Amino acid sequence: MSEIFFPSQEEVLLIHTEIINETGGSHGLRDAGALESALKAAENRLFYETSDLAILGATYAFHLSQAHAFVDGNKRIAAVVSELFLELNNAKLKATNEQIIELFLDIAASRLSREDVERKFAEWLITEKENNE
């Protein structure tokens, strides 16, 4: 198994600031513990369950959306961090912007379970190897 790279909490905080500056909304971390827990969820799943990038990326998407760790921009940070995680690990999602937006709205509205999100990520995931074929 290749080494799997994870975004740091510091990177996520910087990304959140950039997102809010670019797209609007309120700055601020509402719950540092919720952020830490959401970020650690993917690392814990790697350690205890799986190295599947779709599952780990979906874990970021689901837990960051549900954690509401920030005052504003929770869906946006969840989308960016889950895609950043995949990019760090030479993968990406082959989904349209509309599909991504719908997915994160559904996660935030609790219309999808973590397993539902994992299935979507598995359906859309392209690894570097697949991308070069």
Task: Describe these PLM feature segments.
Residues 1-133:
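FIC/Doc superfamily catalytic core
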